[in-house]
Amino acid sequence: MKKSVRPAVSRASGERGKPEVAGTTGTGKPVSKSSTAAPLSKVKSSDDLLAAMAGGNPTSSNAVAKTKRTASVGTTASTLDKPKTTSGTTSKRLTSSVTKETNLTRDRLRTSRASANKKQSAAGTVVGDAASGKRSRSQVLVESESRMSKSKSDGQISDKVALEAKVKDLLGLAKSKDVEILHLRSELRDMRVQLGLGGKELQEGPEEEEEEEEEEKPHVSAITAADVESTLILLQEQNQAIREELNLLKSENRMLKDRLNALGFSLEQRLDGSDKLFSYASLSPDLAAGSGQSDGGGTGTLTSSVEGSAPGSLEDLLAGHQHGGSADNLDSESSEVYQAVTSSDDALDAPSGASSSSESECAPSRERSRRGSSGNASEVSVACLTERIHQMEENQHSTAEELQATLQELADLQQITQELNGENERLGEEKVILMDSLCQQSDKLELYGRQIEYLRSLLDEHHVSYVLEEDIKSGRYMELEQRYADLAENARFEREQLLGVQQHLSNTLKMAEQDNAEAQEMIGALKERNHQMERIMESERQGRAAVEAALHEYKDAVSSEQAELSRCRAQLDQERQRVAELYSLHTAGDKNDICQLLEGVRLGKEEAEAKAAKLQEGLEQAHSDLGHLQETFSKLDREYREFREQAQRQLSEQERALEKQRMDLQEKETEIADMKETIFELEDEVEQHRALKLHDNLIITDLENSVKKLQDQKHDMEREIKILHRRLREESMEWRQFQADLQTAVVIANDIKSEAQEEIGDLRRRLQEAQEKNEKLSKELEEVKSRKQDEERGRVYNYMNAVERDLAALRQGMGLSRRSSTSSEPSPTVKTLIKSFDSASQGPPSNGASVTPTVSAAPLPRTPLSPSPMKTPPAAAVSPIQRHSISGSMSAAKPLSSLGDKRPTYTDITIPTEHLLRGSAASRPPSALQRVSNMDSTKTISVSRRSSEEMKRDMSASEGASSTSLMAMSAASAPLSLSSSSPTASVTPTTRSRLREERKDPLSALAREYGGSKRNALLKWCQKKTEGYQNIDITNFSSSWNDGLAFCAVLHTYLPAHIPYQELTSQEKRRNFTLAFQAAESVGIKCTLDINDMVHTERPDWQSVMTYVTAIYKYFET
């Protein structure tokens, strides 16, 4: 590719006076790259968008390169003013494609929401029809659960659609920025043409030709990967290519600045520099005309010296090679330039070849007459261009950083999807196990039903009345069982359908992969055939060159023989003259001598004639060989032309086949997109299935509880039957005894009456004494409570006053030390005070301290990973008044714990259940009372476990109630402190999974709060935290943090005593980073950044900075 471009470059560089060099040198770039924007408007999801991006621009290309190539095509077809119009049209096309993509995403979001609402309404009508029977309560629960699950699935779908829309918006923004960069490049190109800097344009042609060759090779292999992982990998590679292109643009900008500085055109002296370049541009044709050298070396020297004096630049070498004509000439001229010319004035005054000094001296005088409005315009345009280029680079960095963060989150979402698929399979297995257990429970229910029928028959035999609630409940349970058998059958049918769809999709995907592999094989065979044709053409060229060399040799031999023949003819003429002279002498002189001479001459003549005849034969033979070689050459030329036409036809056929393969690949991509949409629908169905499964689990637990209740009722019935039998026997014995004692009852009635009156008086006296004692004890209890509260309050007040005094003294000492030193580290006395305060805020323990540490004091000693319900800030960031309020709330919670220490046992609550026995305790044996009390205590334990949340709410609501209600509720809340300590007591599975997710990734809650990606959510949190701070503008995680002020501002919101923010400046980077890292390490945040790297790099690694900021957020906010 380089060989094909260099002649055009050399021809363009020869016309130095024409300003169209920068526009014509880009003709070597390919035109086909502009078609890569077409697949971007046809995608349907984020994965298809990524695949289209990867397919259109596989490895080392980016959006900037695309726009650069389209602009180069536009510039070849028009003059220098046309790139602006072409860039405007491309920007309009790109913005229209972006608006089309956003409209597509909005329509897709509306259709998905409408379908979800339709599903909800259909489910609501079905539930309403089914709720007309006896299952109203269970159907209401099903409806609420289904609504929650569908709302959750709709939220996930909307989150995915929002992410896709956000990615598309970011890509549209990147495209618009690329269009602006293209516009700026066109203006830069115009400025280069005006300034005479065309070397850079000459280099871009062969470099981008090589890039296209490298891009077309992995183009086919990049499309072969059809899954999401390969797409993400390709997008990461593309992002890396974007980074490389940005680095290339930076180096280009830096090199242009260096070249301007080397030429003497600094940013403050642009006017003079541009005037001097214009003077040189007007002078260079005269110098070229005045030079007397034939090789053009002087012109190459001046061009290389003006166009780029920076050592080692490729533009200088290329320009020297074009103007000089050889590598030796290039080296000599470049060395001449670097030794002789050091500034723009020297370049203007330096002689070129044989040009005289008068011409170089009259050039500045000509240029001074041309200074005017062009200098001001060039100065303003260059300043605007540099500012806009800096702004575009910053925006490009932020966009690339956000794209990388979005890619990482997409990879995380893919991993979560895989985990959910595995969990779905596990839930399917668990569903089978639960169905088996449900069948076993139904068998047990049938067995218990038979036992209840037997017990009813026994009750009917003894004529005991009973309530028919069991029949109603059993009918309801049978109805529930039938319903869940139907649900299980429907779930099994849906699973079979899903398996069939999955099998169909996998078969389709395999067929698509096979077709793709066949297409790859065909393309490889065509490429191999093409290479073979090229090798044959090369061998034919070599044979033709050999034939031409032989022909040249024969021509040289013929020319030498013709020269020899002419020499022999001249010699023959001389001999004939000599013979004529000898004949004349023969006639005049002696004949013998003459005869001898004639004989010698005759022999010489014969030899000369023989030699001439031989030479004539050789000449004829050479002419015949020459004719034969010409015929052979013409034949080979015809064969070569026929072969070239055949090769061109085969290449056109191969191109048509390749285009057909590309169309097939696009069809496969659309099929893959449809498959991905079906996969999304299947994931929605999986979410619904999971919600139904959760509801089934809840109903199964209800069924198990109902079975336990039935067992308890069975035991109650058996116990009541035994008690009734016993009462019947006792009443019969009492009746007989009453009949026997009826006669003596009248005699002793008066005695019994008098004794009863005495006992009544004794009981009244005891009752009065017990009431007085109770009042006295209640007063003592109130006095003890008030005394303890006063003592604790006084102790806390004294301790807080001492802490405030110590902190005031420490602040004064730290203020003095801060003025004298540059870095402020926390003194060890503050740490010891904080530790002592934390230890003192938890003690001293009271009599009931065995219960309260698990309730109130547990959240205080926190770790960075454990989410605490009460977010207590660290001790260094809490004021003394806040500490006093925290300690006051803790001391107010202690009397409740002291009351909880006097709770009765479980059997104290079971006394009201004795009314079921319909008799007095005096007529029953103690064993029956013991059994009944044990049974009721087990009931209260189970009820207390089920109603843990209600008891907690009652406990919190009844703090101001009477002590009797607290005593009554403490028995039920005592086991709650044990059960609520486990995470499965009062936490639903969704909240439990959310807690696990927050422990693994603390940014998930932040992303839910602010919306969007985790990177943007953390960025918004940082911006919210640093509101009101001066000299801080956080737009990314790289350049916004390079001076350390952002770290200091974020940490100053939590640790104001550690960071004197008003004294900090952006110039003292090392001090800022040192203060921030030491403040974070003082509270336990480990530093993961290197101070030297942060100080010396303009753009630190955004991932490491984001990790450190995440650690800060995790410590202070979770």
Curated annotation (Swiss-Prot):
Ranges of biased composition (kind: Acidic residues): 204-215
Feature: compositional bias, Pro residues: 861-872
Cellular location(s): Cytoplasm, Cytoskeleton; Cytoplasm, Cytoskeleton, Spindle; Cell junction, Gap junction
Ranges in coiled-coil conformation: 225-264, 384-438, 475-796
Calponin-homology (CH) domain ranges (all copies): 1012-1117
GO biological process: cell division
Keyword terms: Cell cycle, Cell division, Cell junction, Coiled coil, Cytoplasm, Cytoskeleton, Gap junction
Pfam families, per database record: CH
Region (Disordered): 1-157, 198-221, 289-379, 771-790, 837-876, 920-1001
SUPFAM superfamilies for this protein: Calponin-homology domain, CH-domain
Comp. bias regions, Low complexity: 343-363, 961-986
Highest taxon, organism lineage: Eukaryota
Biased composition annotated in UniProt, kind: Polar residues: 57-102, 112-123, 838-855, 930-945
Biased composition (Basic and acidic residues): 144-153, 946-956
Entry-linked PROSITE patterns: CH (PS50021)
Gene Ontology CC terms: cytoplasm; gap junction; spindle
UniProt xrefs under InterPro entries: CH_dom, CH_dom_sf, F-actin_Monoox_Mical
Entry function: Involved in cytokinesis and spindle organization. May play a role in actin cytoskeleton organization and microtubule stabilization and hence required for proper cell adhesion and migration.
Family: Belongs to the cytospin-A family.
Subunit and interaction comment: May interact with both microtubules and actin cytoskeleton.
PANTHER family the UniProt entry points to: CALPONIN HOMOLOGY DOMAIN-CONTAINING PROTEIN DDB_G0272472-RELATED, CYTOSPIN-A
Protein name: Cytospin-A
Organism: Takifugu rubripes
